[in-house]
Amino acid sequence: MLLDYIKSRRGAIGIGTLIIFIALVLVAAVAAAVIINTAANLQHKAARVGEESTRQVASGIQVLKITGYAVNTKNITKLAILVSPNVGDEIDLSSTIVTISNGDYKASLVYGGQITYVNTNGTRDIFNESWPNIANPTTEFGVIVLQDADGSMNNTEHPTMNFGDKAIIAINVGDVFGGIMPRERIYGEVIPEFGASGIIEFRAPSTFSEHVVTLQ
């Protein structure tokens, strides 16, 4: 009878051990599934963040040159900012903001819907003949299209720059903060909807010996 009890006891212990083993296997399987799912989510998030970071770094707009127009050789009243997109996504100028400051005032300008196209026939006078008629020059900028191979900037509501396109952002600084005086320091940014901003930073020459003045 004792022998039967011992055998029964061993059998119960064996079944208990088997149950514990199965439970451990199930727990391990659930844990593995959770880890795999978490890893997949993290990988997806990392890929998305990487794509967004690449987009921010690769795309954007660059300021190639800034030229001013001094109507009386004493005060610059017009500013022509030559811009082009970086390698990356296209740039919608209708969603672009230009900030500009002389230290005393800081203005934020938006696209006003005025475009002049000189990419086909050229122009002999950007600052007068081809200058866009900006309706609200204190708060808006116009656009002069210089290079647009695929016609992506023909839409006046959403002029869109692709890689290789070049345009001038036209600002009437005489209306924004009274113009730019000799030796005056100007700084700001051309801020696209996505990507890196173009930098505006220059100090005007001590004298304006000509009407057209290279600033940056």
Curated annotation (Swiss-Prot):
Propeptide position ranges: 1-11
Signal peptide (residue range): none
Domain of life: Archaea
GO molecular function: structural molecule activity
Pfam families (UniProt xref): Arch_flagellin
GO biological process, one term: archaeal or bacterial-type flagellum-dependent cell motility
Record's keyword terms, sorted: Archaeal flagellum
Designated name of the protein: Flagellin B3
